[in-house]
Amino acid sequence: MRIMGLDVGSKTVGVAISDPLGFTAQGLEIIKINEDKQDFGFDRLAELVKQYQVDRFVIGLPKNMNNTSGPRVEASKAYGDRIEELFHIPVSYQDERLTTVEAERMLIEQADISRGKRKKVIDKLAAQLILQNYLDCNY
């Protein structure tokens, strides 16, 4: 059983994968997307799905702190709907409030990574945190 976690943004999708037993999440990569050009990185996702034999996706939902949904929640759900259509693999959603903040804090405090380097890995780490939270709550 492999679960793929996604942190869907307007310019990038952070990707993480679980270990085969579903205990831990590891960040994989960041896929560049372009919403204006309808380029959502599905070709690369297809390669990763095949490579890791994914049988579930977990997509982070960026809810507001008061638990309301904003436009990015709708965009994330639309992305999930499209994934289900394309790959015929179930999609679950995980509250991702503050995961990017937590990821940035980890990179600053624990890894002492410069701002430029943080931008290159933060979405991947956020996807890892989203997936790990899902695994901790469900397995």
From Swiss-Prot:
Chief location of this protein within or outside the cell:
cytoplasm
Q: In Gene Ontology terms, what is a biological process of this protein? A: rRNA 5'-end processing
Q: Which Pfam families match?
A: RuvX (PF03652)
Which cellular compartments is it found in? Cytoplasm
Q: Which GO terms describe its cellular component?
A: cytosol
- Look up the EC number in the record and give it: 3.1.-.-
Q: Name one GO molecular function term.
A: nuclease activity
InterPro entries attached to this UniProt entry = RNaseH-like_sf, YqgF, YqgF/RNaseH-like_dom, YqgF/RNaseH-like_dom_sf
Instruction: Kindly state which keywords UniProt assigns to this record, in alphabetical order.
Output: Cytoplasm, Hydrolase, Nuclease, Ribosome biogenesis
Q: Which family does it belong to?
A: Belongs to the YqgF nuclease family.
Q: What does this protein do?
A: Could be a nuclease involved in processing of the 5'-end of pre-16S rRNA.
Which NCBIfam families does the entry link to?
A: RNAse_H_YqgF
Q: State what protein this is by name.
A: Putative pre-16S rRNA nuclease
What is the phylogenetic placement of the source species in the record? Bacteria, Bacillati, Bacillota, Bacilli, Lactobacillales
